[in-house]
Structure formats: structure tokens, C-alpha cells
Curated annotation (Swiss-Prot):
Assembly description: Heterotetramer of two alpha chains and two beta chains.
Protein name, per record: Hemoglobin subunit alpha
PROSITE patterns (alphabetical): GLOBIN
GO molecular function annotations of the record: haptoglobin binding; heme binding; iron ion binding; organic acid binding; oxygen binding; oxygen carrier activity; peroxidase activity
Amino acid sequence: VLSPADKTNIKAAWDKVGAHAGDYGAEALERMFLSFPTTKTYFPHFDLSHGSAQVKGHGKKVGDALGNAVAHMDDLPGALSALSDLHAYKLRVDPVNFKLLSHCLLVTLACHLPGEFTPAIHASLDKFLASVSTVLVSKYR
């Protein structure tokens, strides 16, 4: 459960992300593909090379979805219901991949926001991404 302090931290961090959400999403995906090569199996139709338009496009989707989740932190299941359905029923993504992408997102944010990425912000973002992951895998059961 996200505390009021967590919510404040998450909103403050996401305000710093701002218009870079898509770029950071794409960078996190690239990190995930490089660090965890098995995740590439879900993107056989993508050009996974550095800076590819397809990775950038999917990174924007990731960034937009997270922005939507930040805006609806008090109703993550409602805000992410369609994405949960898509990943569980159509794409059939292994739930562990959400944790891997979350880790890569944290690394990416730490690289781009070193002054703002305090231990408290890190902890709040980690809890938030874990909550998002939990919602995304909720339809698997």
C-alpha cells in the first residue's frame, strides 16, 4: 500500500520525468533486452537495435501507461485494467518480466535524475512499480 508520503514522492519524481517518459521507457526496454535477453522473445517482430523506432514507440507506450498510473494511483486496477487484460490474455507475457522492466526503469531513472533519486524516492518508486506489476499480473490467476 502506498503511503501519502510515497504518493507525494512518486508525483514529484514523475513531474521531473515529464516529457522524457517515452525516452526513459525506451531506454529501460533496451536495458531489459540487453540484461535479460529472454525478454526479447515477446518482440520477435521488432527491430531491437539501439534507437529503433519500434523500441521508441513501445517505450512511449510504457511511459504513457506509467503516467496514467501515476495520475490514478488511488485506482490502479481501474486505470490498468485494459493493459492487464492485454498482457494476460492476448500477449501472455510471463509475469516475471514486469519485475525485470521495473528494475530497468529504476536504473534508468537513477541515471537521469541523480539529484532527485534519493533513497526515499527510490523506495517509493519501487513500491509503486511493484504495485503496478501486481495489478498487471492480477488477471493471470
